[in-house]
């Protein structure tokens, strides 16, 4: 890819988006029984921050959790950054899920797209978001959270920002959890 100033002048096209690797769930996590698993479509997607701010799910990492053959089906929420590369990685993960080429015992319930900056995303990003909206049961967008840049731990900010609170509420409704 060539970059002139802040404009991309050439885009490297891969034949297919990269698949998300699969990693067996360690035996010591056998006692963990989360409502769902946060799965990053790439490193730095924001799963641990969303996990801390919402207090929901289990942040597994940038790979599919692989469960034992006799396991029940586990729900997953995919997370990516609102960048061309982040959404390309999300396209690969969603494609794996749709084609059933990823691990068994995993059901994708949606994709959370986390802003990469406070600026309006480029056209390629908004186009990929629109495409993925048709491929996943749910798609949420979380805006840029400037306050998190100064936080040692996401929960240090106190109440979650409004769009994160709305995401939490939507997830609770999705999984039919009574809200207190």
Task: Give the location of each predicted region.
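Extreme N-terminal, non-catalytic leader segments
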Residues: 1-35, 169-178
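Glycine-rich phosphate-binding P-loop
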Residues: 34-58
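Short, aromatic/basic amphipathic alpha-helical patches
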Residues: 51-52, 122-135
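Inter-motif core of Ras-like GTPase G domains
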Residues: 62-82, 97-112
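Conserved Switch II/interswitch segment of TRAFAC-class P-loop GTPases
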Residues: 75-91, 116-122
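Short beta-alpha junction loops
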Residues: 112-119, 145-147
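Beta-strand-loop-alpha "switch" segments that mediate conformational coupling across diverse proteins
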Residues: 129-157
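C-terminal boundary of histidine-terminating zinc-finger modules
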Residues: 153-168
């Amino acid at each position: 890819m060539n970059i002139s100033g802040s404009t991309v002048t050439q885009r490297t096209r891969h034949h297919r988006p990269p698949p998300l690797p699969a990693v067996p769930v360690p035996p010591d996590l056998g006692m963990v029984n989360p409502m769902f698993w946060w799965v990053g479509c790439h490193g730095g997607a924001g799963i641990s921050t969303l996990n801390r701010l919402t207090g929901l799910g289990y942040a597994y990492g940038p790979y599919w959790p692989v469960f034992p053959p006799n396991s029940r089906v586990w729900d997953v929420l995919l997370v990516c950054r609102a960048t061309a590369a982040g959404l390309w990685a999300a396209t690969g993960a969603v494609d794996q899920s749709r084609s059933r080429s990823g691990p068994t015992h995993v059901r994708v319930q949606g994709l959370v797209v986390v802003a990469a900056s406070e600026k309006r995303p480029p056209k390629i990003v908004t186009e990929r978001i629109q495409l993925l909206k048709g491929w996943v049961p749910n798609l949420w967008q979380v805006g840029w959270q400037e306050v998190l840049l100064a936080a040692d731990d996401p929960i240090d900010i106190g109440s979650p920002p409004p769009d994160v609170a709305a995401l939490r509420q939507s997830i609770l409704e999705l999984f039919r959890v009574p809200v207190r």
